[in-house]
């Protein structure tokens, strides 16, 4: 499919601020600085759609973007940034959990992990959280331009083992820089959402 239009709709904290038109949603979540904003901009062909911050932990709200006027891409706050207070970390966690809890229009959650590193305890917890709430999980390993083709297999094994992914889980590797395989990834993520509309 092609992303023909993308627009920012709202930054939300409370449930009553979420869009209520019942269009399908796909949420993106990951550690601070995993490249979440960059991948959203890359997939939507809009360089400034999601704000790319040099400061980790900057995204503290839930941002809703309407794609093709058919479905929402939802940018959840980044987690795991060390230089914030425990109170602030708890607040981010509560914001994410509030969204995941009984969110009818949410069809799948994309968990982003950095392919250069072993997934953290926070990544594992997030994966378990998403499964607990009964959503389909798609795992994308970001920044794949930073490792060689020879390292891809080793990275895939480490990520799958650490997160406890099923053997048949289709782990996707992607780089927002070279955008290799972007069209296939867009189809993989969004096609079935469009079918539901």
From Swiss-Prot:
The keyword Zinc does not apply. Mg(2+) binds at residues 37, 59. The keyword Cytoplasm does not apply. Its cofactor is Mg(2+). GO terms for biological process: division septum assembly. Gene3D superfamilies: P-loop containing nucleotide triphosphate hydrolases (3.40.50.300). GTP binds at residues 30-37, 57-61, 75-78, 142-145, 174-176. Residues 22-195 form the EngB-type G domain. GO terms for molecular function: GTP binding; metal ion binding. Keywords: Cell cycle, Cell division, GTP-binding, Magnesium, Metal-binding, Nucleotide-binding, Septation. It holds the Pfam family MMR_HSR1. GO terms for cellular component: cytosol. Belongs to the TRAFAC class TrmE-Era-EngA-EngB-Septin-like GTPase superfamily. EngB GTPase family. Necessary for normal cell division and for the maintenance of normal septation. This is Probable GTP-binding protein EngB. It comes from Clostridium perfringens (strain 13 / Type A).
């Amino acid at each position: 499919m092609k992303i023909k239009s993308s627009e920012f709709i709202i930054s939300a904290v409370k449930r009553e601020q979420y869009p209520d038109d019942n269009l399908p949603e796909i949420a993106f979540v990951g550690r601070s600085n995993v490249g979440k904003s960059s991948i959203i901009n890359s997939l939507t062909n809009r360089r400034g759609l999601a704000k790319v911050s040099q400061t980790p932990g900057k995204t503290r709200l839930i941002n809703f973007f309407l794609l093709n006027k058919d479905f929402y891409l939802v940018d959840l706050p980044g987690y795991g940034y060390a230089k914030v207070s425990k109170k602030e970390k708890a607040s981010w966690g509560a914001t994410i959990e509030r969204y995941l809890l009984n969110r009818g229009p949410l069809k799948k959650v994309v968990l982003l992990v950095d392919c250069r590193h072993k997934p953290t305890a926070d990544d594992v917890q997030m994966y378990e959280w998403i499964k607990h709430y009964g959503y389909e999980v798609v795992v994308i390993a970001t920044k794949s331009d930073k490792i060689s083709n020879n390292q891809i297999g080793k990275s895939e094994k480490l990520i799958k083992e650490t997160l406890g992914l099923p053997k048949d889980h289709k782990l996707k590797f992607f780089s927002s820089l070279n955008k290799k395989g972007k069209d296939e990834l867009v189809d993989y993520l969004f096609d079935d959402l469009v079918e539901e509309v």
